[in-house]
Every structure is written in C-alpha cells, then in structure tokens.
C-alpha cells in the first residue's frame, strides 16, 4: 500500500467489527486518506482513533445505504445488508469495465431487530443491469439451509430470564453485537431488572450506539457497576465482555476471582451468548470450568440456542448468486475450504467452473469486460 499510496483515493468500510476496523489506526498513520462508512461504523472507529489521538488528523465521511461516492474512476454504492452488527453494508463498485459487487459480511434476516431487511431488490436490480464480478462472504458456505434470525435469540433470553426469578444474571457477548445487547436490555426491562455494563469495549460500544440511537435503553434501566450493591440479585443483569475467554476480559477476571467489583455467587446465571471463534475453544472452556467450580449456572451454545451467526448459509448464498447473476465469481472471507465449498455451490447452480476464482493469499485477479484471469502476486504476511 505504501508503494502505491498515490493510487489510493480512500478506504471504504462495510461494517464496524474488529477484524474490519482494528488495523485502521495503524494504516492511517502511514496512509492518511479519507475513510467512508456508515454512522455506527465510523462511531466505533472513532473510539479507536481517539485512543490513538488521531481524531483530528483523519478525514471521515458518513454514508447512508443507497448513497454513491466517486473515488477516482470508480463509483462506490452502499447497499443495506443484515449482519451481527447494525449498519452493515455491501458495496457495488461501478468501474469503467463493469460492476463489482462485494457483499461484505452478510446474512438474510427477514425479521431483523431494527426491522430493516437486507436490500434484496437492489441486488436483483444490479443483476438485471449486469454484474461483472461477485465477491461474496464464504464464512458459512459449508452449512446447509438458512441462518436463523437474530430474533430467535431474544426469545431464548426471555425464556431464561423467566426461569431465573431469584438469581443474578450475567450475559457475555461481543461488544459490537448491538442487536444482541438490545435484546438483553429488552429482556431485563421486561422482567424489571437493572442493567450494568462492564468491560472497556462493551462500555464504549454501548455508549456510542446509544448516543447514535442504534440502542434503545429505557429510562432508569442502566446503572453504574458500583451501584449494583444497592440492588438484590433478582433485580440485576450484568452485560460483559469475555465471550471468547480472552485472558484480560471482564468475564475471565470474574471467573478467576480477580475482578475488583464483581464476584461470582452460587447460582448466578451466566449466559455466554457467542459461538467459539476457531482457536478459542480451550480459553472458553477454561472460563466455563472456573465459573462452574464457583457454583455458577453457566448457559452456552451446547445447552441453549443463545447465539446465531451473522453469516449467510448455503441457501442465502445461492440467493445472492441468483439475484446478482455475475459473469465471474470470486468467493471471499473464509479459509480455503470455505472458498472451495462456495465455488462448488456456484457450480451446482450452473456457473462454469472456469468463471470462478478461488484465490490464494497475494494473488491478483485482473478483470475486464470479456475475461478474468490471475495475473500475478503481491507480498502478503505478518507485518
């Protein structure tokens, strides 16, 4: 990137998850170009820029779904999607040789928490106009069927809250999953409980989302963690970080007895509302075991359906292919096995295998109106 800095017109974000925005403060220190993203995405990014004392030195442009931004010879169009974070978008990149659609991380949720369904009509319209290349999320390409709606988790929360009338409830989830946090708050409000937030990233995310009106917190529901001592256990819900067993997270410190404000009590109901990111299984098991040894009642994915994925399964991926009808297809966002599975899915729908490109890291795909081909490589690896 630094070698081609004169060619870079801007950085375009699809959503505010850590793996999509976490490196930006470091990149922007060397390549200071405008950043484009939706309101919540930029709000979460600004928390990071503030920590790096870079707020004043970076240019940020807020976009809304449906908006188009001209960058050099290309026009980038933002399309509303559903994901495990609010304000996610796909990109339709209008180039001189044709339209490239990048789905970003997405799922098709017909009953999303905010009521805003993925803009399937726009994908279909682009398909009719002609899509040169589709780049589509492959994370769940191995999984059959459809991904469940986020609303399903809310129903499980309500069931667990109803079954826990006397004990304190803690919920660990990803701090960026605003819709999941909203459902915890909804259940707490329904059962007359106060909500306290712990974990730096969780506190920041809740503050940002509520200030930008992506999170509705009923009046007198949110309390400071230090106020919890003034309430009975049956009046409390604590939302925390640490769903992946991260060593320094709030839940890990609670489990090890090192948290300054919260200690585990016998029969605390602790809900881990997330699936294990590959590689984190041992860390999560360690935390669960410690909590169980202290007498807590721990609920996780193998016990209740308290998590749904933010990524499309096979039927949703087939729908995206059917709507956009791309001339060429490049599966993205997944390991090689996920990309290969996505390729086979496209072949099963009638695409020519020669028009599908499963790329290795660093390979360059060159596309024009008539053909697509791998033309070389660029250096990749740890920095």
Model-derived segments and spans:
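His/Asp/Glu-rich metal-coordinating catalytic cores
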Residues: 1-12, 17-230, 249-263, 282-286
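Hard-cation-handling environments
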Residues: 143-383
